[in-house]
A protein has these predicted regions:
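Long, contiguous hydrophobic alpha-helical segments, chiefly transmembrane helices and signal peptides
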Residues: 141-143, 158, 195-201
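A structural motif
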Residues: 156-158, 248
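Metal-dependent nuclease catalytic cores that hydrolyze phosphodiester bonds in DNA/RNA
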Residues: 1-155, 162-178
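Residue-level recognition of conserved beta-strand positions in structured domain cores
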Residues: 158-160, 222
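Metal-dependent nuclease catalytic regions and adjoining charged, substrate-binding loops involved
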Residues: 2-7, 168-169, 178, 186-196, ...
Length: 279
């Protein structure tokens, strides 16, 4: 028994065989180059969106970014893989509209499920989603897809769901189901609030860009990471749900144009966790 305990403790002290190298590799990778000169729907829908900090970033301020550790990067990559899987199915079906890029010569084309590159004839076309922008308000985002040929056009948002999703979006579902994520997933009856706001923003941005040609509904595709269970929710466009979000964007852009930094809208006296990072 004593020898078993010693071997166990010795094993705990051993240097990792491969994990350390992977972690160092991830730390050496450059950070993503997400623009800070536009407002991203995924950011401005948050309750902790700060006018002052957004002004700082949009006027040349540098955001404090930390590289994700191995676990967090694995979570991100798993989500990306789930997105790609669903998008690839719609591409194979011939229903996926948006911008595609040839993986060989990088020729870009906008269309519905192209199968061959017009530039070089290669068949490896990578989906680059649909960019939705409002130039006046400097809002820019990417919806996960625009589906054509299956009834009326619709946008799609693909969401991978795990325990962390429930803790952040709907902790009550975990509590009501005794922490069982499988039961919690089955009990989801509608899109989570932040997903709904993001989707409604994409619908409104689409309307502002494409007018009557824009989709009037969005389909949320939820997949449970643990066992690949899935759900879908269809939501019609309703601008009233996000009018206050666009109002927030307008407040920030007016401040940027006037070159006057606004006060923190979350805590005017002491500032918030975001704007307190401003040097």
């Amino acid at each position: 028994m004593e020898n078993d305990l010693k071997r166990f403790l010795d094993a705990k002290k051993r240097e990792p065989r491969l994990l350390g190298d992977i972690e160092r590799h991830l730390m050496r990778r450059p950070l993503g180059d997400r623009s800070t000169t536009v407002l991203h729907p995924s950011e401005i829908i948050k309750n902790d969106f700060c006018y002052k900090y957004s002004y700082y970033l949009m006027t040349g301020g540098v955001s404090k970014k930390e590289k994700p550790n191995l676990r967090l990067q694995s979570i991100f990559d798993e989500g990306h893989a789930i997105h790609h899987k669903w998008q690839n199915w719609f591409h194979e079906m011939g229903n996926l509209y948006g911008r595609f890029e040839c993986k060989h010569c990088h020729t870009s084309v906008t269309g519905t499920s192209p199968t061959v590159c017009e530039g070089c004839g290669d068949t490896r076309m990578e989906y680059k989603e649909v960019t939705l922008v409002d130039d006046k308000l400097r809002i820019a985002g990417h919806t996960d897809g625009w589906i054509k040929g299956i009834g009326n056009d619709c946008l799609i948002e693909i969401k991978s769901v795990g325990a962390g999703t429930f803790r952040y979006e709907a902790p009550e579902l975990l509590l009501d189901n005794d922490g069982d994520i499988f039961k919690a997933f089955n009990s989801i009856k509608r899109p989570f609030r932040s997903h709904l706001l993001q989707g409604q923003m994409y619908l409104e941005l689409g309307k502002r860009m494409f007018g009557d040609e824009a989709p009037n509904e969005i389909v949320f595709l939820y997949e449970l990471k643990a066992d690949q269970s899935y759900k879908e929710f269809t939501v019609k466009a309703d601008y009233e749900i996000v009018d206050r979000i666009f109002f927030k964007a307008e407040k920030v852009i007016k401040a940027v144009e006037a070159e006057v930094m606004p006060e923190c809208n979350l805590n005017p006296e002491e500032g918030c966790k975001s704007c307190n990072l401003i040097p």
